[in-house]
Regions:
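C-terminal substrate/ligand-recognition segments
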Residues: 33-52, 80-86, 90, 125-150
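Active-site SXXK
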Residues: 49-50, 73-101, 135, 190-194, ...
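Short active-site loop at a secondary-structure junction
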Residues: 31-40, 63-83, 96-101, 129-130, ...
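Mid-domain, small-residue-enriched loop/turn segments at the edges of structured enzyme/sensor domains
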Residues: 113-119, 152-189, 198, 202-205
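Proteins synthesized as precursors that undergo proteolytic processing into mature forms
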Residues: 61-63, 74, 89, 95-96, ...
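Structural recognition of the beta-strand scaffold that forms the well-ordered cores
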Residues: 41-45, 53-55, 97-100, 134, ...
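Conserved catalytic neighborhood of penicillin-recognizing serine enzymes
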Residues: 93-154, 200, 212-237, 241-242
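A penicillin-recognizing enzyme superfamily signal
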Residues: 1-46, 55, 61-66, 80, ...
C-alpha cells in the first residue's frame, strides 16, 4: 500500500544547510524533514537603474524547485501600509497632518455587524491627536483605517498596479492589513519607486545576451514609469524614515 511504502526505510540523499549527506529514512520522514526548512528569499535592486544586485530564491534548487522571489506569493502584512499613505500624499496630505487615534468601523456587504480593526500601536496614545508620520511609524491600524475611509480601496490597488504589482489584489477595506498575497519581486520594485524620486523601475536581471564570440544576440530595455511627483516621493521617504527612527523598525538601528 501507499502508506506502507511511505513508512519503509529507504536509502536517500538529503540536503543540509552545509551540504548533502547519504542517509536512510522513510519517505514520510523526509517530507517532514524538508517541511522544517526556513523558506525565505532576498532581493536587492538598484532603485535608479533597476539592476538586480543580489538574488536568493530559496534553499538548494536541486531539492526545492521553487523560486520564492518571482513565483511565491505571500501575505505582506504591514509592509503594504506605505501605499495607502502614498495615496494620502497624492491627495494633499503631509506627514505632519494630525488625526484622532480612535477606532474606525466599516459596514460590510451582507454583514449586520460592522468591522472594527484592532489597534496595533501603543495604548497610551489612544484617543489622542497623532501625526500621519507617527501613524505609519507605529503601524497603527486606527490611522490606517481612517485613511481607508478617506480613500477607496480601489484607489490603493490602482496605485499599486502602477508601481508594478501584477498579483491579484482584492480591493477591500482590510487591504491595509496586508491580506493580499504578493511576490517579493513586486514589493521590491514598488518600494524602489520612493528612492528613485517617484519613478518606478522594474527589476532587471539581464541587460543583453551574447553568443560565444561576443556578438549581441538580444538586448533588453528597462521598463520605467513616473508614478509619483518628486515631492510626493520625498514625503514618503520622510514617512518611511520615521519607521526606523522612531517606530516599529527602530531595532534595525541597534
Amino acid at each position: 500500500s501507499i502508506m506502507l511504502a511511505f513508512n519503509t526505510n529507504t536509502p536517500m540523499k538529503v540536503c543540509l544547510w552545509r551540504g548533502e549527506i547519504d542517509t536512510i529514512m522513510t519517505p514520510y520522514d523526509s517530507v517532514r524533514y524538508y517541511k522544517y526548512f526556513l523558506r525565505s528569499s532576498f532581493l536587492v535592486e538598484d532603485p535608479h537603474t533597476g539592476y538586480v544586485k543580489a538574488y536568493v530564491g530559496g534553499p538548494d534548487f536541486r531539492y526545492f524547485k521553487w523560486d520564492a522571489v518571482t513565483q511565491q506569493r505571500k501575505q505582506v502584512g504591514s509592509t503594504i501600509k506605505p501605499f495607502l499613505y502614498t495615496v494620502a500624499m497624492q491627495n494633499g496630505y503631509t506627514p505632519c497632518d494630525e488625526v484622532e487615534n480612535i477606532p474606525r468601523s466599516f459596514d460590510l456587504p451582507g454583514d449586520s455587524v460592522p468591522w472594527i480593526p484592532r489597534s496595533s500601536g501603543p495604548k497610551d496614545y489612544h484617543g489622542k491627536m497623532v501625526t500621519l508620520k507617527w501613524g505609519l511609524a507605529q503601524s497603527e491600524n486606527y490611522i490606517s483605517a481612517w485613511l481607508m475611509q478617506m480613500f477607496r480601496p480601489s484607489a490603493v490597488v490602482d496605485l499599486m498596479k502602477r508601481m508594478g504589482m501584477r498579483s491579484f489584489i482584492d480591493p477591500v477595506p482590510s487591504i491595509f492589513l496586508g491580506t493580499s498575497d504578493i511576490k517579493l519581486e513586486e514589493m521590491v520594485g514598488a518600494y524602489s519607486t520612493y528612492a528613485n524620486r517617484g519613478v518606478y523601475t522594474r527589476p532587471m536581471y539581464v541587460t543583453r545576451i551574447e553568443d560565444k564570440n561576443g556578438n549581441v544576440v538580444s538586448r533588453f530595455t528597462q521598463q520605467i514609469e513616473e508614478v509619483l511627483s518628486e515631492d510626493q516621493a520625498y514625503l514618503m521617504l520622510d514617512l518611511l524614515q520615521g519607521v526606523v527612527l522612531i517606530g516599529s523598525g527602530n531595532r534595525l538601528r541597534r
